[in-house]
Amino acid sequence: MNLLVSKKSWMLAPAIAVASLATLAFVWAVMEPEALRAAFDEHGASFVEVLTIPFYALIVPLVWLCCPFGGSTKRKALLCLGVSCVAAMAVVKEMDLHLAAMTAMYPEIVAKFSGTPFKMRFLTSGSVPLGAKAVVVLYFALFFGVFAAMLLYYAKTLLKAFFRLHPVAWSVACMGGSGIMVQLMDRLPAWWRHSQGLAKDQVPAAFSSFCTAFEEGGEMMLAAFALLAILQAHAIYAPDRPAEGLDV
């Protein structure tokens, strides 16, 4: 049985998701908070972050060599270019290159600003120069903007395919779920800290390490599901597949 194209292939992504979440929970339970943070989050240099980068980097050649899209050559090239752009920006984010570039260009602004400059409050601050804001806007446009545009383009097709148990749609759904988990775990410590009126160093170490494990682990899961969706789509469709790329 080919796991990519069988009638039960839609179950592959959820099974991987459950196994991944269970593994992350186990790792969090057995590791000390400080050791876990060192292994998962060291500004792009930790073991897990370094291991995640090839997953995102592999998306770029894979989407061109195993094109999952149908239609004209121009359409396929534009969609592959969009996927490549998002994957490249994901590598930039994982390695914290965007923060390094901002720090190099505007060191005084970054030093005075509490937290990362890649936040909405950075854009709304009156003390931040227009050039620095433009860099942040460009980052958001290339990463989240292109991703959102592609998601909206395929939203109706993916929704129909999801309820028809299409493997690609379920892999994309798990990818989206991983992305939501990453954002939630990134914000959760700050939300909880503000709600309790605590200082940053008063957040319980176990809670902080839990969020770190699922945030960084979720980024690897996201990349893995993207690779799986590309492989499934390429395996399922013939060279003359329909223009929408999903036969639903």
Question: Where are each of the predicted segments found?
Answer:
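Polytopic alpha-helical membrane-helix bundles and their juxtamembrane interface segments
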Residues: N2-V91, L99-M102, Y106-D247
